[in-house]
Amino acid sequence: MTPFALFDFDDTLAKGDSILPYLLYCIRRGVAPKTQLLRAVAGYIRWRLNPACASGAKKATLSFIKGRTQAEMDDLARDFFREAQSKRFFHDGFKELCRLRGEGYRILVVSASAEVYMRVLPEFLPVDDVLATPCALDAKGCYTGEVGANCKGDEKPLRIAAYLQEHGLSIDRARSRGYGDSPSDAPMLLMTDAPMLVNPKKKLLRRIPHGTQLTWR
């Protein structure tokens, strides 16, 4: 059995939501049109009215990636993290990742953020793998514009279970730790005996009152 450290990303390892900064960066780089903001706002409104539309909201926000190669978008994602997003990393979170890596934990980031940019995260933080909201590719390695199930809430344990099966691993629950900030992270955090609540929202505190509270900057 393997000791895991399971991490959310937005507001756990980095300040704020990442998809809007990513979209704005793509607009500045000329990869996405300015009108993409209108599509994103429309998608956000649909999601607020119906939370089940989360994947549709991401699809609207990221429709500009359709037809672009994975290699091209990987390079853009590296620039995004290097020039913009890395400035939002919590210093305390980075130190914790380094400590856990040194102690032999397998570190897995499980995030509702989009795979199109999250897939390069291990190049910027000491993590082993990333599970994010999937963005479909065609046979030529180009993005289709389709977005898979939103990796949030109950979807997180499902994705983790599939990952464990794929890699022939099992979680050592007693020695593993989970890190998150919102109530939607609770299903993942409760896969371990040590839920760590990072700058937690009140609903998460009510959901997991026995969790260890952490204040990260």
Can you describe what each PLM-predicted range is?
Residues 16, 51, 55, 67, ...:
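Electropositive phosphate-/nucleotide-binding environments in soluble metabolic enzymes
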Residues 1-50:
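Active-site neighborhood of HAD-like aspartate-dependent phosphohydrolases
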Residues 66-76:
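Acidic catalytic patch
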Residues 45-49, 56-65:
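Helix-loop "lid/cap" segments that line or gate small-molecule binding pockets
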Residues 48, 64-68, 135, 139-142:
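Active-site phosphate/ATP/adenylate-binding loop shared across adenylate-forming ligases
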Residues 21-22, 56-60, 76, 80:
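A general alpha-helix detector
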Residues 1-2, 75, 82-108, 112-217:
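C-terminal cap/substrate-recognition subdomain and adjoining C-terminal extension
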Residues 36-40, 56, 91:
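Short coil/turn segments at secondary-structure boundaries
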